[in-house]
Amino acid sequence: MDADHLLGASIIRIPPHHYIHVLDQNTNIARVEIGPLTYIRQDNERVLFAPVRMMMVPPRHYCVVLNPAVRDDEGQVQFDGSGQVKLRHADLEIRLAQDPFPLYPGEEIQKDVTPLQIVYPDTALRLQALLDFEEEGGEKRVAGDEWLFEGPGTYIPRKEVTVLEVIKATVIRENQAIRLRARKEGLDRSGVQRVTGEEWQVSKVGAYLPGAHEEVVDIVSAFILTDKKALHVRAIRPFRDAGGRDRRTGEEWLVTVADREAHIPSVAEEVVGVVDVTTLNSRQYCVIMDPVGADGKPQLGQKRVVKGERSFFLMPGEHLENGIQDVYVLSEEEGLVLRAVEAFIDTQGDEAEEEERESRAKKRGVQRRPGDRWMLRGPIEYVPPATVEVLLTRTAIPLDENEGIYVRDIKTGKVRAVIGQTYMLTQDEELWEKELPANVESLLAQSRDPLADRSDRGRSFGQAERDKTRVVSYRIPHNATVQVYDYREKKARVMFGPEMVMLGPDEQFTVLSLSGDKPKRPNVIKTICLLLGPDFCTDIITIETADHARLQLQLSYNWHFDLKQPADAAQAAALFSVPDFVGDACKAIASRIRGAVASVQFDDFHKNSNRIICSAVFGFDEKLAVRSSLRFGQNGLVISSVDIQSVEPVDQRTRDALQKSVQLAIEITTNSQEAAARHEAERLEQEARGRLERQKITDQAEAEKARKELLELEAQSAAVESTGAAKAEAQSRAEAARIQGEAAVEEAKLKAEAQKIEADSELARLCKAREQELNYKKQIDHLEVEKQQKLADIESQRFKHLMDNLGTETLKEMARAGPELQVKLLQSLGLKSTLITDGSSPINLFTTANGLLGSLQGKDKDE
């Protein structure tokens, strides 16, 4: 609002160094009015803006004016005929430090007052000409030219020149260089003619300021070379290196410390890598592939052996075969199998003969042809030449008396076993792996004792990997035998334990596949050794009597092989004539038992089971007496005894009925015993409850007595209190105060005495109650102990009286009542004799027959 009011005012006061623009509305021309001035505005004039401060450019500053006014040689502003200021339209004018000046109509400030740019030492401004002009020194500049304004100095801008960038000098330190590239053809700072894109290096220590047409590509640091590091470089274009040697494109070489201590790669060199020194000690060597010859060129396809002590750098194109290798130091128990790669004369093999042929002046070598194999034995220190290839390192194999290895001659193919001596394979021998059947491998790998672990077939034993080149050995336990068959000789040999059996290259174990489990199943037991016994085997068989009673028998047989030591070859071979002697023997015995039992009744079998089974198994001799054993003539197996472990009915209904009758008898006896014990316990419990109630009544009476005494004391206290009050009322009113005080004192004493009496009575009551409660607890615990003792005595007496009252005959009748009923039921079915037993409580019939025979013999003696 103030500015608008000021512009509309007729009188405008212009301070010093201020100005305004006044527009003549008749001619439409603006002019400048400069203060200090009091300007009176005419009616046809309009002030365009309020007084504005003149432009002030301080020293070392400048500003840029757009559309500047035209001035004459004396610096005066030029006007046209109408009085308007002449302007250089679209032109610029840079004004430096001067007196304050106004902006004429049409002039604009394109760039405000700005400090002049100071160019410091080792820096420069890269300038570019926008227009053709001539500098004060007479040098002509064409639009597009670029040059440098180097410091130190202050840059005065021109309208024809623009500043592209500020360039700083690059500091070059020791062992450094800068790589430059020419952006335009011309001379560099050294005066050398450069073409566009050309690169060169400057390694002079100090600050380097690139020229206007130069650009810094990179700062290259020198590679410090030592005795342990070298530089592998490659030429990327033909040039002459620092050593004065001409290099071709693609050529590679090493720069070592012998050439220079620090190497700065030139623009024509490419660093491939840093090569470490290869150091060999006195016990190392290496084989260099494609070695560089004396002419500096790699000899492709050749090898060179270098032995320590030595340090060297691998030249470009060279590489080590298998790296740095240790020299072969062989002892007396070691050797090397060598093969010739090329034909040569071997002098290494004659070193052992030199000691015996010292008289010979000239040493003769051995001619080796490509592919020849030979063995070098220790002790020796050996470095294989380039014409020899090391195939194997042999080490002597120490063998004990019971150890051996399989050796095959690779020329003849024959395999032999070397046992009991330290042996080193020759160049024509190799270890041979003996393959065994899978079942034999598993049996040998298991750490199972054939005798102690013969029944642990379900348990898994630890298995160790077998060395197939070692001679297969097996320790035969005591009282056992093993059969080994030689397939080349077609012979078998039998060995008896304790012994160590070792297989030849063509020998194999005879594996026995025996029956096992209960009942017997074939191919359950796999074993190599055959136990000679004595031992036992158990089998379960099912038989049927003449009256069709099916029974299941579990029998155990004691067996052994009848063999006299030392045994001849025929007897030993007969042991393995029957592959499954267990299954065959069990089947034969089961067949005999079934045949014998099928012709007898169940009742007879029940009474004479042992005699029937033994006679069926062993048979009778000439005197009609049961034999003591059963012998199998094929392999000499002898069955010495038969143990009847259990006899159970096969029919489920018979088994259930028998079990039910036994359980019923047991339940009747148990229920009667439980009823008597329950009655006795209830009686004792009632007696204890009565004593407990009596004790409670006694305790209550004592408590009431104590309460009565308390009430009497309270009544006496009340009487004393009332008497004192009446006596005080009868006395004169004159002594009322004294009497009242004495009465109060007496009343307090009586109250305290009453409270004391009440507390004492309560304490006595509580003590009596606690004492009675403790006595009650003690009596309860004592009664509980007596109760348990009496219950135990009653139970023992009850059982004793029960047994005495029942009597032996009654118990027998009770025991026979159920079975006789079952027998009668079975007889009603047409069965002549039966045997009923509980499946969970089997009847042992092993001594039944002997008991019957013993009773008969006793009767005969009595008669």
Swiss-Prot record:
Region (Disordered): 349-368
One GO CC term, this protein: nucleus
Compartments in which it is found: Cytoplasm; Nucleus
Source species, domain of life: Eukaryota
Keywords: Cytoplasm, Nucleus, Repeat, Ribonucleoprotein
Keyword Ribonucleoprotein annotated: yes
Protein name, entry field: Major vault protein
Any GO BP annotation: brain development
Pfam families xref list: MVP_shoulder, Vault, Vault_2, Vault_3, Vault_4
Domain (IQ): residue spans on this chain: 677-706
Coiled coil feature spans: none
Main localization (coarse): cytoplasm
Oligomeric and partner information: The vault ribonucleoprotein particle is a huge (400 A x 670 A) cage structure of 12.9 MDa. It consists of a dimer of half-vaults, with each half-vault comprising 39 identical major vault protein (MVP) chains, PARP4 and one or more vault RNAs (vRNAs).
Purpose of the protein: Required for normal vault structure. Vaults are multi-subunit structures that may act as scaffolds for proteins involved in signal transduction. Vaults may also play a role in nucleo-cytoplasmic transport.
Signal peptide: none
Species of provenance: Danio rerio
